């Protein structure tokens, strides 16, 4: 119903930062029946774990800044399509608008792509282990990670994804001030806004006025990197202690 009369349906799965998965196949099929184009932001899933075009989407969107490049040193995005006519219109719009990557930016992206698979594998393994540990910790009230069998979106994620990714979000049983202090007290994990790099990054999302009020005040979004998983856990414990969260 909501898509009637629309020109484009823009989806994101998993969502950021709640890590909710949607039934892409069913939604895309419904949009197609209405003649509505579909674009899917696939940044968190990455092309390794999910293929929106194979599910019928017209456009797959990626922030190349994130996992594809993977070193937090590039600003670049990509649109991918199987439709040659649509590609022609997108390419023309890009050319006329001047949004063309420079050779250095293209080289940085290519460099990152060469290690993309191994980086994603390690980050995902770390995320699975940390999500399991966090889910058993009394200082945490909720962990969102589709790889957990207890996660509300586990079955749906399994049906569309080849893996569960390297993003976790969790709610801390503490005040906003304590959660901010926790994020500021980590020594290995960086308190910053970006994600998808080799380094682990976290932040309290509601510190930004533009973040949705549906996001809990005490939610931490955690982009898990490729560091030693026990070093990461030790840093989390250090941050808990520094913020006096028990």
Language-model region placement:
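Conserved PLP-enzyme active-site core in the AAT-like
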Residues: 1-139
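Short amphipathic alpha-helices in soluble, non-transmembrane regions
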Residues: 90, 180-187, 235-240
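A common structural junction motif
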Residues: 97-98, 185-196, 239-246
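Positively charged, small/polar-rich N-terminal and surface patches that mediate targeting and assembly
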Residues: 99, 142, 196-198, 203-205
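Short, well-ordered beta-strand elements within core beta-sheets of diverse protein domains
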Residues: 109-118, 165-173, 220-225
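PLP-dependent enzyme catalytic core of the Aspartate aminotransferase-like
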Residues: 119, 200-246
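Conserved small-domain helix->loop->beta segment predominantly found in fold-type I
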Residues: 128-187, 206-214
């Amino acid at each position: 119903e909501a898509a009637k009369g629309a020109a484009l349906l823009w989806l994101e799965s998993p969502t950021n930062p709640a890590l909710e998965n949607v039934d892409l196949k069913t939604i895309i099929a419904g949009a197609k029946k209405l003649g509505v184009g579909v674009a899917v932001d696939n940044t968190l899933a990455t092309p390794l774990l999910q293929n929106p075009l194979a599910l019928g989407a017209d456009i797959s969107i990626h922030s190349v800044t994130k996992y594809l490049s993977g070193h937090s040193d590039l600003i670049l995005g990509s649109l991918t399509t199987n439709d040659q006519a649509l590609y022609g219109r997108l390419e023309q719009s890009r050319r006329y608008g001047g949004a063309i990557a420079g050779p250095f930016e293209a080289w940085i992206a290519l460099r990152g792509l060469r290690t993309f698979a191994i980086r994603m594998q390690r980050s995902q393994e770390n995320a699975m282990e940390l999500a399991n540990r966090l889910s058993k910790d009394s200082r945490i009230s909720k962990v969102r990670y589709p790889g957990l069998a207890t996660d509300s979106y586990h079955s749906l994620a399994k049906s569309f994804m080849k893996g569960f990714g390297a993003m976790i979000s969790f709610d801390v049983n503490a005040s906003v001030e304590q959660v901010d202090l926790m994020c500021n007290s980590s020594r290995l994990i960086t308190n910053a806004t970006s994600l998808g790099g080799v380094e682990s990054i976290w932040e309290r999302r509601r510190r930004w006025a533009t973040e949705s009020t549906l996001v809990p005040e005490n939610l931490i979004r955690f982009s898990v990197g490729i560091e030693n998983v026990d070093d990461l856990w030790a840093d989390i414990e250090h941050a808990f202690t520094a913020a006096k969260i028990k």
